[in-house]
C-alpha cells in the first residue's frame, strides 16, 4: 500500500468510529503530509530503520515497532523509542543480548513477535509451546505485542475470528500480558468496502474491549 492510499484508508477507518488503529509500514522518516496523518488520529508504525522510528513523530513507544531484522546499530539507536518485532529464534537471541546493557536491574525489554496462523514463518500456531519456551529462557525479554499475517486469498472474516482466538491462546499459553496486537493485511480490503470484514472487526473490537484490553492495530 502506497502512502497516499494509506492516508485515505486511515481517514476512512477513523470515520467508522471503531476501536481499531491503522498501522503504517515505514522504511524511512515520513514527509510532512504523512507525519501529519500519523498524528491526526491514533495510529501505529512498523519501521525498518531508526530514522523511521524517530521521524514518525509518535511519542508512545508502545505504538511504534522496529523490525529486529534491522542492523544492530539501527536497533541500538532506536532503543527506548519503540518495541522490537522479532520473527525468528535468531532475532529473539539477538534482542536478548542487545537489550541487556540498556536495562535496569529487574526490568525486561518489551517486544513483539510475528506469529503465522497457518505456517510460513518460524513462529506458528502449531509451535506455540516451542517458541514460548525459547522466550522464557531469555533473560531480558517479555512479549507484549503480537503481529498476525493474513492470507489475502482466503476468507478474511473467518481468518480475523481465528486470529483473535489465536491471540487469546498465545496470551494464555505463554503466558504473557499483551499490550497490543496487529492483524496484517486488512486495512486495504477493509477500506475498499468489505462490509462483512467490517462487521467482524467491529465485533472483535468489542470483544477486545471486554477481554484483552489491548491496543488493536490493522495494517
Feature roles, as predicted:
Residues 33-38, 54-57, 75-76, 92-101, ...:
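Distinct, well-ordered alpha-helical segments
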Residues 80-81, 87-145:
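Conserved anion-binding
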Residues 1-83, 96-100, 107, 177:
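A charged N-terminal "starter" segment
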Residues 3, 7, 47, 72, ...:
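Electropositive phosphate-/nucleotide-binding environments in soluble metabolic enzymes
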Residues 10, 117-218:
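Active-site loop/helix belt of alpha/beta enzymes
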Residues 49, 70-71, 88-91, 111, ...:
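Glycine-rich loops and low-complexity Gly/Arg-rich segments
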Residues 26-32, 49-51, 69-71, 88-90, ...:
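Active-site-proximal loop/turn and secondary-structure-junction residues that shape catalytic pockets
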Residues 45-50, 66-70, 108-117, 141-148, ...:
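Non-cysteine beta-strand/loop elements that form the S-adenosyl-L-methionine
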Amino acid at each position: 500500500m502506497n502512502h497516499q492510499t494509506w492516508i485515505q484508508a486511515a481517514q476512512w477507518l477513523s470515520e467508522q468510529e471503531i476501536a481499531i488503529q491503522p498501522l503504517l509500514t515505514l522504511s524511512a522518516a515520513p514527509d510532512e503530509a504523512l507525519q501529519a496523518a500519523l498524528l491526526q488520529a491514533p495510529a501505529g508504525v512498523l519501521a525498518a530503520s531508526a530514522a523511521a522510528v524517530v521521524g514518525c513523530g509518535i511519542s508512545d513507544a508502545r505504538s511504534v515497532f522496529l523490525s529486529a531484522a534491522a542492523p544492530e546499530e539501527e536497533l541500538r539507536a532506536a532503543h527506548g523509542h519503540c518495541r522490537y518485532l522479532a520473527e525468528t529464534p535468531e532475532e529473539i537471541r539477538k534482542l536478548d543480548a542487545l537489550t541487556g546493557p540498556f536495562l535496569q536491574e529487574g526490568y525486561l525489554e518489551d517486544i513483539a513477535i510475528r506469529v503465522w496462523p497457518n505456517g510460513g514463518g518460524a513462529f506458528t500456531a502449531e509451535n506455540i509451546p516451542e517458541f514460548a519456551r525459547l522466550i522464557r529462557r531469555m533473560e531480558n525479554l517479555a512479549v507484549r505485542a503480537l503481529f498476525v499475517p493474513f492470507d489475502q486469498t482466503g476468507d478474511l472474516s473467518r481468518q480475523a475470528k481465528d486470529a483473535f482466538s489465536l491471540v487469546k491462546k498465545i496470551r494464555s499459553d505463554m503466558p504473557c500480558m499483551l499490550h497490543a496486537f496487529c492483524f496484517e493485511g486488512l486495512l486495504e480490503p477493509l477500506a475498499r468496502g468489505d462490509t462483512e470484514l467490517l462487521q467482524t472487526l467491529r465485533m472483535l473490537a468489542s470483544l477486545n474491549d471486554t477481554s484483552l484490553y489491548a491496543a488493536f492495530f490493522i495494517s
